[in-house]
Amino acid sequence: MNDDALELLNRIFVDCEEDKKGKYAQYRFFAYVSSMYHKCEVLINESIPGKSGKEHKVPIAIKSNGMYMAIAFNKATGNAINKKDVEKFYQIADDVKSGEHGTQLIDAIYGSSVGFKGDALIGLEELSKSRKDDAENKLEFKTANFENRIYSVVKC
């Protein structure tokens, strides 16, 4: 790597600088999620069909032995995540989990560099608790908030 590349990596991952388009935040989130799943394949902007037949474009998907293990979304810019955002996230995760390719899906992670509104967190927790608690339907919903140069993850 040349000096420019090393300086850019330092700005993104050490200094945690932000850029207008939110790309640096996305890189940090992708690196964070990939670090949670060792020996797994990390796929970016993956199209995954749900039970509904709709193809969902997932920003980051984790595969192990050809099966999806986790999906993750991140909001890098704009306003804090609201209840409508988490409802859409839940619907996508539920549709993928219920589909042919989601049978081994265990985690759905919603990351944010702009925060979560209180009603959004409550809404996602309620949706998560409304799921059947059997092994076939189990899906862990997690939020990852990036603040003070670190991610804090909360299971909903």
Per-range role (PLM):
Residues 1-13, 139-156:
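Surface-exposed interaction regions that form or flank ligand-binding interfaces
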Residues 29, 33, 42, 59-62, ...:
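Hydrophobic beta-strand residues in large extracellular and virion-surface proteins
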Residues 40-65:
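Active-site metal-binding core of divalent-cation-utilizing nuclease and nuclease-like domains
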Residues 67-145:
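Catalytic cores of nucleic-acid endonucleases
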